[in-house]
């Protein structure tokens, strides 16, 4: 089920499979829904804290239940490849690494009962001390090994200058099916002794994980500037814009919805049938690149007043048992598995 209020929930259909990593954002417990981690000042940006800046990340999620669950959280420091590091808590955290989630509210007048939970990082109990990759894990008080949900975030220090250029004139075609990225990284203030070999650069296309690129070395170095150009890893398929849909009401069909039906005990949003666009001309559409926002047409408090509905997707294409179709976006947590 998808929360009624998932407005501008952008969809991108992909025909390839991807295994889910153990440290990816996800909800192993099927009762946990609508997991989000955002900077409230930049809700469509990546989950990033600037060390010592006063930035805050807000974590919000629902648990399908009529009763409150006693939940706790912890932070895991990770290496560049998102594997857990060997640092002890006191080396990367100020405060206590395990805390109780006490901010919760019950859903109001919804067919599907749920409890909405909120948490902020940093808070009065804990704050990151080091830049790097972090994993926030949520688990029941009675069983710390049973992770119900986890989400990635990053803590950064602005020690390098980064400039980039995206071009449609690429090493393989011109204004056709690819885009090529060039990067320049000024390391003069970084304090890195050997930036040519010691910097690990990760590039994502609109937050996607399936084609994420990790660069170990630049093409060349000019003074203190690392130059990444004409590198095959930075050549991306251009693709199309994400598909958009809204499920903000059960009283009328919102954007992208063909009909709304009630089939006891749930409302169903039947989306308009879509089709593959790989062979179609590119059409610009202002989307949020797979992000979603919780909203409900008649509510001023959608976090607890928006209902969950069943959303029916359909893709008009010849059947091929060798092709798997996935929905990509933040609402599927960028995972290509049985839930997407």
Predicted regions mapped to residue ranges:
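Bacterial Sec-dependent N-terminal signal peptides
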Residues: 1-23
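Contiguous beta-strand segments within globular domains
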Residues: 28-77, 174-187, 300-313
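Aromatic-rich carbohydrate-binding modules that target alpha-glucans
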Residues: 93-117, 209-218, 312-340
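Aromatic sugar-binding surface patches on proteins
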Residues: 100-103, 108-122, 222-244, 339-340
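Ligand-binding face of N-terminal immunoglobulin V-set domains in extracellular IgSF glycoproteins
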Residues: 111-141
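Low-complexity, Pro/Ser/Thr- and charge-rich linker/hinge segments at domain boundaries
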Residues: 155-178
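Long, internal scaffold/assembly segments composed of regular secondary structure
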Residues: 195-280
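Basic K/R-rich, polyanion-interacting modules in nucleoproteins and related proteins
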Residues: 273-321
């Amino acid at each position: 089920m998808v929360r009624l209020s998932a407005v501008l929930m952008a969809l991108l259909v992909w025909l390839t499979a991807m295994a889910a990593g153990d440290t990816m954002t996800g909800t192993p417990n099927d009762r946990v829904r609508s997991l989000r981690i955002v900077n409230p000042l930049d809700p469509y940006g990546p989950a990033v804290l600037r060390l010592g800046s006063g930035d805050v990340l807000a974590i919000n999620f629902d648990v399908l239940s009529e009763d409150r669950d006693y939940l706790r959280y912890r932070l895991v420091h990770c290496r560049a490849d998102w594997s857990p590091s060997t640092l002890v808590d006191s080396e990367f955290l100020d405060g206590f690494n395990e805390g109780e989630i006490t901010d919760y509210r019950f859903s109001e007048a919804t067919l599907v009962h749920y409890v909405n939970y909120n948490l902020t990082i940093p808070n009065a109990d804990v704050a990151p001390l080091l830049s790097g990759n972090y994993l926030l894990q949520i688990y029941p008080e009675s069983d710390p090994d049973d992770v119900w949900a986890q989400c990635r975030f990053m803590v950064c220090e602005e020690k390098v200058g980064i400039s980039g250029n995206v071009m449609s004139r690429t090493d393989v075609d011109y204004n056709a099916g690819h885009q090529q990225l060039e990067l320049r990284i000024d390391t003069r203030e970084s304090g890195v002794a050997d930036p040519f070999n010691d910097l690990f650069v990760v590039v994502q296309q609109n937050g996607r994980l399936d084609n994420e690129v990790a660069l170990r070395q630049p093409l060349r170095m000019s003074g203190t500037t690392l130059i990444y150009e004409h590198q095959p890893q930075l050549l991306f398929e251009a693709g199309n814009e994400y598909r958009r849909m809204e499920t903000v009401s059960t009283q009328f069909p919102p954007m992208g919805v063909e009909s709304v039906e009630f089939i006891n005990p749930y409302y169903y949003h039947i989306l308009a049938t879509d089709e593959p666009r790989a062979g179609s001309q590119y059409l610009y559409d202002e989307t949020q690149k797979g992000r979603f926002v919780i909203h409900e047409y008649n509510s001023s408090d959608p976090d607890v007043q928006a209902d969950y509905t069943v959303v029916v997707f359909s893709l008009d294409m010849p059947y091929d048992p060798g092709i798997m179709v996935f929905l990509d976006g933040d609402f599927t947590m960028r995972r290509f598995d049985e839930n997407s």
